């Protein structure tokens, strides 16, 4: 049994400049959950998120109270705002949320506004902020962090952040303190700030993931969250469009370490030379995870089992081993579990308890998520995002799954890879051809160019399209009920369109 708190009190605004965030449930409360292997999470206790007074809000954003309002929780989305919430108006690249401050907002139960301005007929609470609204939100996040005295775990890396963050929270369920993790992959400035603002008063441990598109972003997130445990999972070729090399990406990820204080813990992947090359501040404690014999927590065994639908893992710490089964496909999950064990055991959870907790792990939505449609198709829904490393791992996952029908890889473009993007797409297609893949579906200009370069466009086992909707219609002509279908692509390719079509369409045998 474990306890995890999620910030279900608001949505990230729709104009976040990075990737789209999944929508949290329409709740103004936080649930603790108990889960056993193979079961859905069951709520056992309902807790309210932290309540903010107008005075606290004004102090947090360095603003002033123009009109006092009652205490309440915080929202950034007028569409999902519920009664007794303050609305934090953020100006984005596409929308200015101040434009939505109307009497209708009051009718929904909004008790106050935090922002630069309100309409003339606004008669509820108003805390005025000066300057950039995003800076004010981050200032409030930093203030919220200063009110929390427990441990904060910050996780970054090129791949596996969300999955590992969830595994860490799950593994920490073996300790006595209540664990709070950021919702989904709220890993940019807005998401991390909202997660900090939502820390419940009775939480003892916080787990946050931190993402970036460019240099300096991780440093800002780390300054706001001030993690006492700082985790770097890996360095890969995502976001190469904004960097000149993998070494530059490594330095950007390494910003999470820069301002670590003496006594802070840095949890590092010993198998990644770029991670290990990063300088550490004086006085920090280094905890290593990986396959190398010198690791504090070592991955001894990672084997595909249950016909490729689960992973058998053996971890070792101080000569003691634990063996457990992760009920989800993908050998890459073993190293994620190793990282989670490194964090949890350092914070006092016994290794055996970590193994027991991780044996109940359920994959994050649209990340190696195994789904069986009513029409008989087995879908590996890995549609949330993609880079060369994660796409290769997904193809390997598909290759490992036992299948009575065809193995089908439906791939969308991998974005933000810079000047060598076509070469990366060619490498992925070559990997598909060398694996036991029976049918390949491709969508996007980059994959189409790569397929042309490799003379694959006219191949009978390759289906191409310029958008996901068209590809879904075409690929369904070739799919049979017993097929296993991987769907993978960058967020901007909207590959969930294909997933939904696979789920909803009746399939006739003999395609």
Regions found by a protein language model. Name each.
Residues 472-478:
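Short amphipathic alpha-helix with an adjacent loop that forms part of the alpha/beta core around
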Residues 126-132, 461-471:
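Short acidic-hydrophobic, aromatic-tinged amphipathic segments that line or gate anion-handling sites
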Residues 92-95, 364-366, 383-464, 508-511:
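Active-site beta-alpha connecting loops in nucleotide-dependent enzymes
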Residues 37-48, 155, 365-369, 391, ...:
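ATP-dependent carboxylate/acyl-activation modules
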Residues 115, 120-123, 229-378, 430-433, ...:
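Acidic, Mg2+-coordinating active-site environments of NTP-dependent enzymes
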Residues 57, 85, 104, 140, ...:
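Residue-level signal for inorganic ion chemistry
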Residues 134-270, 274-282, 500-510:
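Phosphate-binding loop of NTP-binding sites
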Residues 1-139, 401-403, 417, 430-431, ...:
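N-terminal leader/targeting and accessory segments in enzymes
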